Amino acid sequence: MPVLTLSSASSIILTSKLPRQYQWLDKEPGPKMLMEGLNHYGCLEHKGKGNNPDITKWAKEIGGKVAEVYRADEIPWCGLFMAICARRAGYALPKDPLWALNWGTFGTGQPVAMLGDVLTFIRKTASGATAGHVAIYVGEDDTAYHTLGGNQSDCVCITRMAKSRLYAIRRPQFRIAQPKNIRRVHLASSGKLSANEA
């Protein structure tokens, strides 16, 4: 049975679901988008005709064009995951938030990625077209960012993304003050690199 932990941000985190390398995240007090994202850790896309009702409910909660366009969890949903994290944390969404690279306009640009930042990445589709991926920074090693995101291996999880694919680093515009735990996090380079998040 999973162990539930109530964080200082009043979020329930399923601590037993986080891999050992990332269990230190359970003790982090924020930022809010990261805490919201951790609440969904392990959420899986359903294969075939059925859809995960949690994922499709996110689209309805965001509303507008997102609810009109997003009707199945087999549609790339990294932008939808980021939208639900941002909305529930109280932040305005970029235009057309389902498009990952549009998150390159969210918040404020940063020269160095730190805990809780929104990172966008370039990816190539099967046809060779340029597309994107968006996720939340939890750390880095020499060659990769470790990111919490949706539609990473068809679920919400933490994976390694090659630094060479980075498109933009964005930080939420904090209303009061930047949380004190915003920092670079150096991690071991274990696990394979993500190659395609579609």
Question: Where in this protein do the model-derived segments appear?
Answer:
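Residue-level marker of intrinsically disordered, low-complexity segments enriched
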Residues: 1, 10-11, 53, 120, ...
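Short, Lys/Arg-enriched charge-dense amphipathic segments
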Residues: 67-82, 113-133, 174-175
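Short alpha-helical interface elements
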Residues: 61-66, 106-111, 172
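Active-site signature of cysteine proteases
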Residues: 142-183
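...with weaker cross-activation on analogous glycine-rich loops/strands in unrelated enzymes
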Residues: 26-31, 91-157
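N-terminal capping segments
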Residues: 2-89, 180-198
